Swiss-Prot record:
ANK repeat residue intervals: 133-162, 269-294, 295-324, 325-354, 355-384, 386-414, 416-444, 445-474, 476-504, 506-534, 536-566
Keyword Transmembrane: no
Record protein name field: Putative ankyrin repeat protein L100
Species name: Acanthamoeba polyphaga mimivirus (APMV)
Pfam family, one: Ank_2
Keywords: ANK repeat, Repeat
Domain of life where this protein originates: Viruses
Signal peptide: none
Matches recorded under Gene3D superfamilies: Ankyrin repeat-containing domain (1.25.40.20)
Disulfide bonds: none
Length: 602
């Protein structure tokens, strides 16, 4: 038997092309001596022949095995494949095997003459997530070219990965590889390595968000791999929380319980996990955590927020004080609209009047009309809460709550001014119509409702106010001026169509529009008679004082009739600065500084 060592790559199951390889002697019948890469041969590589680099075949398997040849056997046959890249025989002897994920395997190859510094090996190591091998390959032959190859891969990692679930393994691989890179920063390639670390962080962030943000991602990844990922990569609590959220979505109990074991002494974080268990209505995990030494009052609030009645009942049975923390459990249930929990808490002595009737005020603010009705039925005095309750409902646009409050006797008179203005502010023409329908005199509130609607760009409300007869020219056309300042061209147009005076306050609306450099509004105003030269050319001067103004806006104003000769020095200085002294003939600036005659500046 020959003592020379040859190499072969095999999978963990030791199969290839329907042939099962066993330790010791392996053979084939009908050995083929003709052709290249044909069945009926046992292939292997000679490490002493550079053309037969075993690393070409890394993608064929998981382990490297030593091959020796039974040269003393009279039936033994061997040839070099016509491709020249491998040998083949009818009989081989398989010896020691070494895993390709181990850097020592590559050191062993190199000791037998294999060139392990081929660039394609770097790609293979990345694609198979062998971080220790990749680091070994770089460290043993560190140069800029090889680092640039890694950099290129990092910039487009998906080019090597076809399976979307591999995102998990990419992130895991990069977390580990980044630790290796940190040990290389003190050398002549430190800038490149630092960039690789930064690229790693970006890829990790991107893929991690994709992993944890997609409910269907990674369902076939073993839970033990997720657990290993958490402990091996020193993840912060924010990242762990994202994994937990994904785990609850997909009912991955092993991961959740593993994280609980990691934070068994961190009661604050256990409360966070409890909140997630409530969010996903996972009673088993919630009950596990309740048995820990966590704050049960805060847990009750989490259960109320999530609408998890089963756990609310469980905690109340354990004599948790439902009126502690200023009655937050009931207030929370009212805020998030969980009527069944509100009913349960009230029937278990929760104080509906706590914190100056906060429960009903929160229900009004968040639009839960069924809870508002329930609390009134349980004894809330509508006259005590009516003002703030109406304001809360109006602020958020909850017309149905306002209708219920009025039906139950809420006094709207004391707050009708506030309600009118808030309805105009919050884009709710339906509430405004409701107020008019129940007798509120909107027109008696002055111009403020119109001003608020114009400032907020509420076109439908402005139209409604015009329809019911509001004076759009009040306060010397303040509504038009506010609309120009806020930049709502559609409202400017509507006001002008209904009689607003574009020249009010000596063309203030146009001057403000020029100050804001609003082409559309300036065009509307000028086309409706605004004087662009008013106040000694103030519109152009205001535009010149706006640092964001563009060259073509100035030309636009001149085309509209702005007088460039008025206040010559101010306009010249601005235009000269804007064009860096090189004013093109295509723009119409027919003057120069300190000259009264018209000369084009070149």
């Amino acid at each position: 038997m020959s003592q020379k060592i040859y190499f072969k790559i095999l999978r963990f199951d030791k199969t290839h092309n329907d042939h099962v390889y066993l330790p010791g002697e392996n053979s084939v019948e009908n050995f083929q001596t003709e052709g290249s890469c044909v069945p009926g041969r046992l292939y292997f590589c000679d490490p002493s022949d550079p053309k037969q680099n075993i690393c070409r075949y890394l993608h064929y398997g998981d382990v490297l095995v030593d091959i020796t040849l039974p040269t003393n056997d009279p039936d033994f046959k061997m040839i070099v494949d016509p491709s020249g890249t491998k040998c083949c025989a009818n009989k081989i002897i398989i010896g020691t095997e070494r895993e390709l994920s181990d850097p020592e395997t590559f050191a062993y190859m190199a000791s037998h003459g294999v060139d392990i510094h081929k660039n394609y090996i770097i790609h293979w190591a990345f694609k198979n997530f062998h971080d220790r091998v990749l680091f070994y390959l770089l460290k043993t032959n560190l140069n800029e070219n090889r680092l640039r190859i890694v950099e290129h891969i990092f910039k487009n990692p998906s080019s090597l990965i076809s399976n979307r679930n591999y995102n998990f393994y990419i992130v895991n691989f990069l977390q580990r590889f980044k630790k290796h890179l940190n040990s290389l920063t003190d050398n002549q390639y430190s800038d490149i390595i630092t960039n690789l670390i930064n690229l790693s962080n970006k890829i990790i962030e991107k893929y991690f968000e994709d992993m944890t943000g997609n409910k269907n991602f990674g369902l076939d990844i073993p839970e033990k791999d997720w657990c290993s990922y958490i402990i091996e990569n020193d993840l912060d609590k924010g990242s762990i929380s994202k994994i937990l959220d994904w785990s609850f979505k997909n009912n991955k109990k092993m991961i959740i319980e593993y994280v609980i074991s990691l934070f068994i002494e961190d009661y604050h974080y256990l409360e966070k996990i409890f909140s997630l268990s409530c969010k996903y209505h996972d009673s088993r995990i919630a009950e596990i955590l309740i048995k820990k030494s966590i704050n049960k009052e805060r847990c009750l609030i989490s259960a109320c927020e999530a609408g998890f009645l089963e756990i609310v009942e469980c905690l109340v049975k354990q004599d948790v004080n439902i009126n502690l923390l200023k009655g937050t459990p009931l207030v929370t249930a009212c805020q998030f609209g969980h009527l069944l929990i509100v009913d349960f808490l009230v029937n278990n002595s929760a104080d509906i009047h706590i914190r100056d009737n906060a429960p009903i005020l929160y229900a009004c603010r968040y639009g839960h009309v069924d809870i508002v009705d329930y609390l009134i039925g349980k004894g809330i005095d509508i006259h005590t809460v009516s003002s703030q309750a109406l304001i809360n409902a109006c602020n958020r646009g909850h017309l149905n709550v306002m209708e219920l409050l009025v039906e139950k006797g809420a006094d709207i008179r004391s707050v009708e001014n506030i309600l009118v203005v808030e309805a105009c502010r919050n884009t709710n023409a339906d509430i405004l119509r409701f107020l008019v329908r129940i007798g509120v005199d909107v027109l008696s509130k002055g111009v403020e409702p119109l001003i608020v609607a114009c400032e907020r760009g509420q076109l439908a409300i402005v139209q409604y106010l015009i329809d019911i007869g509001i004076d759009i020219c009040a306060n010397d056309n303040e509504a038009l001026i506010k609309s120009c300042r806020s930049g709502f061209a559609n409202i400017v147009n509507l006001l002008i169509e209904n009689g607003a005076d574009v020249k009010a306050r000596d063309n203030e609306a146009l001057i403000i529009a020029c100050e804001k450099c609003n082409h559309t509004i300036v065009t509307i105003l000028v086309s409706n008679g605004a004087d662009i030269t008013a106040r000694n050319n103030e519109a152009l001067i205001r535009a010149c004082h706006n640092e964001a103004v563009g060259k073509y806006f100035i030309d636009f104003l001149i085309e509209k009739g702005a007088d460039v000769h008025a206040r010559n020095d101010i306009v010249f200085d601005f235009i000269h600065k804007l064009f860096a002294g090189n004013i093109p003939k295509s723009l119409k600036f027919p003057f120069s500084k300190n000259q009264s005659d018209s000369k084009l500046i070149h």
